[in-house]
């Protein structure tokens, strides 16, 4: 069995690749980059270029590894990637793939939009087995701009989430769940897991934890949705539509959409997910002022 890992250098795919490599599990990484040279067997994969899809399976044959039988399916959430995602699943089936692990999101139900449509498509195929992973917001988002710059330069976190709470999850834990699912496949045809952290935290609480870990006061600045969208657009430089979408998602959190509990990480992997305090201790150098 060879596993195709899409998402190349993404947060979860890169971590999954490391776990598979350490375990000696045959896998091939599909990446949109044509120049990146990584430590694993890689092949070019472009959602908008169908020639690269069939080349993935040819590459496995040329490399002398077992045929691809399972795919870690990571796609963008843009509407224009839904149809290519469906077509790729069908191409993969024609190449003998019968197992898929789809990375979706906690707030995307089957059949709704983006990855939810791919979820529904997989569910309609009686000859395949699939697992859908539905993680909540990544802890690692705070290690990227604009959050990391706000924390380092201003000692602030800006959001429109108000007092809304999120069960923040580490990408390491998402990768552990994906690894366990792919390497210890159960007999069920269809399954979905909510991949959530061990605690519900507001950004006020996140700021308090960072204050303790970093030894300086970090403040959560609660903004109205329109004000956050304006900040992301004018100060951060995000496209207006994207800034508005992110601000809207945060308002959803304010209204309680991410208040969820799940023990799926422990059920699948046998161990609890990382707490935000432990994550902050591990990553605190990233927020330190130099």
UniProtKB/Swiss-Prot annotation:
Q: Under which EC number(s) is this enzyme classified?
A: 1.5.1.44
Which InterPro entries does the protein's record reference?
A: Ergot_Alk_Oxidoreductase, Ergot_alkaloid_biosynthesis, Ig-like_dom, NAD(P)-bd_dom_sf
Q: In which pathway does it act?
A: Alkaloid biosynthesis; ergot alkaloid biosynthesis
The superkingdom listed in its UniProt entry is Eukaryota
Practical use, per the record, is:
Ergot alkaloids are known for their toxic effects on humans who consume contaminated grains or livestock that graze on grasses harboring ergot alkaloid-producing fungi. Due to their strong affinity for monoamine neurotransmitter receptors they may also have clinical uses such as treatment of migraines, Parkinson's disease and cerebrovascular insufficiency.
Tell me what turns on expression of this protein.
Answer: The expression of the ergot alkaloid synthesis cluster which leads to the synthesis of fumigaclavines is positively regulated by the brlA and stuA transcription factors.
The biological process GO terms on file are:
alkaloid biosynthetic process; ergot alkaloid biosynthetic process; fumigaclavine C biosynthetic process
List the Gene Ontology MF annotations in alphabetical order: oxidoreductase activity, acting on the CH-NH group of donors, NAD or NADP as acceptor
User: Which reactions fall under this protein's catalytic activity?
Assistant: festuclavine + NAD(+) = 6,8-dimethyl-6,7-didehydroergoline + NADH + H(+)
What are the entry keywords? Answer: Alkaloid metabolism, NAD, Oxidoreductase
Q: Which CDD domains match?
A: TMR_SDR_a (cd05269)
Primary role: Festuclavine dehydrogenase; part of the gene cluster that mediates the biosynthesis of fumiclavanine C, a fungal ergot alkaloid. DmaW catalyzes the first step of ergot alkaloid biosynthesis by condensing dimethylallyl diphosphate (DMAP) and tryptophan to form 4-dimethylallyl-L-tryptophan. The second step is catalyzed by the methyltransferase easF that methylates 4-dimethylallyl-L-tryptophan in the presence of S-adenosyl-L-methionine, resulting in the formation of 4-dimethylallyl-L-abrine.
Q: Family membership, please give it.
A: Belongs to the fgaFS/easG family.
Q: What protein name is recorded for this chain?
A: Festuclavine dehydrogenase easG
Specify the taxonomic lineage.
Answer: Eukaryota, Fungi, Dikarya, Ascomycota, Pezizomycotina
């Amino acid at each position: 069995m060879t596993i195709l890992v899409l998402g190349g250098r993404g947060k979860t795919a890169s971590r999954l690749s490391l776990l598979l490599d350490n375990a000696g599990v045959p896998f091939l990484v599909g990446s949109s980059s044509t120049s990146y040279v990584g430590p694993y067997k890689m092949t070019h994969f472009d959602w908008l270029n169908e020639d690269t899809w069939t080349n993935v399976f040819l590459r496995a044959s040329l490399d002398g590894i077992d045929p691809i039988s399972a795919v870690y399916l990571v796609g963008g959430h843009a509407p224009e990637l839904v149809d290519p995602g469906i077509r790729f699943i069908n191409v993969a089936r024609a190449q003998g793939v019968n197992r898929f692990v789809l990375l979706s999101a906690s707030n995307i139900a089957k059949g709704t939009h983006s990855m939810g449509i791919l979820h529904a498509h997989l569910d309609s195929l009686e000859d395949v087995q699939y697992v859908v992973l539905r993680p909540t917001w990544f802890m690692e988002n705070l290690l990227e701009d604009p959050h990391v710059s706000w924390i380092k330069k201003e000692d602030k976190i800006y959001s429109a989430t108000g007092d809304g709470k999120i069960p923040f999850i580490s990408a390491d834990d998402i990768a552990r769940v994906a690894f366990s699912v792919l390497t210890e496949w159960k007999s069920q045809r269809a399954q979905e897991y909510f991949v959530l952290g061990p605690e519900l935290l507001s950004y006020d609480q996140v700021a308090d934890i960072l204050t303790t870990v970093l030894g300086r006061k970090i403040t959560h600045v609660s903004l109205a949705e329109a004000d956050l969208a304006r900040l992301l657009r004018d100060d951060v430089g995000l496209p207006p539509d994207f800034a508005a979408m992110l601000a809207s998602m945060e308002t959803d959190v304010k209204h309680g959409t991410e208040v969820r509990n799940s023990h799926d990480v422990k059920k699948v992997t046998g161990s609890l997910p990382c707490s935000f305090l432990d994550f902050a201790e591990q990553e605190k150098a990233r927020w330190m002022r130099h």
